[in-house]
Amino acid sequence: MTNGNGTPPEAAPPPQLNVLAQYTKDLSFENPNAPASLAPQPQQPAINIQINVGAKALAENEYEVTLSIEGKAEGASSLIFSFELQYAGVFRIVNVPQENLHPLVMIECPRLLFPFAREIIATAVRDGGFPPLMLDPVDFVGLYRQNMDRQAAEAQQASPN
């Protein structure tokens, strides 16, 4: 295929995703029942983890993506520990079609941030006197789909029939 004058058309520039910065926006660790909570527990604590992703445009082609992770460990009768982390990154994204931009920001950017957030949480829990909490990998595609389905259902409920 040619561009009309016998030369092949120039290839479109490749998509680019650059991490410009990564940082902890907020970190909280609570061990409200220490030192009693540090004693051996009769059973494994119930651990509950909540993960959310937020994003906002900062400038043309630049986005701040925040990975929010909250968790708590509870024993039979009390809270053992809890934590909250907001870990963010600034990303420059160029040459990406508009229809692919939202999934890229909400799936790939948090996937790049997650290992760093996981390490911060493991260290905070360890420094709180417990074995490090190693979070399992997160299916950000599944999380994205779940959030999109929830938003679609909310929009459908809000619109009159």
UniProtKB/Swiss-Prot annotation:
Against InterPro entries, the record matches this protein to: SecB, SecB-like_sf
Its localization reads: Cytoplasm
GO cellular component terms, semicolon-separated? cytoplasm
Query: One biological-process term from Gene Ontology?
Result: protein transport
Task: Report the Gene3D superfamilies cross-referenced here.
Answer: SecB-like
Coiled-coil annotated spans: none
Keywords per UniProt: Chaperone, Cytoplasm, Protein transport, Translocation, Transport
Cite the GO molecular-function annotations of the record: unfolded protein binding
Does the keyword Cytoplasm feature in the UniProt annotation? yes
Which HAMAP family does the UniProt entry name for this protein? SecB (MF_00821)
Family assignment from sequence similarity: Belongs to the SecB family.
Q: Show the NCBIfam families listed in the entry.
A: PRK05751.1-3, secB
Complex formation? Homotetramer, a dimer of dimers. One homotetramer interacts with 1 SecA dimer.
Function, as annotated, reads:
One of the proteins required for the normal export of preproteins out of the cell cytoplasm. It is a molecular chaperone that binds to a subset of precursor proteins, maintaining them in a translocation-competent state. It also specifically binds to its receptor SecA.
According to UniProt, the name of this protein is Protein-export protein SecB
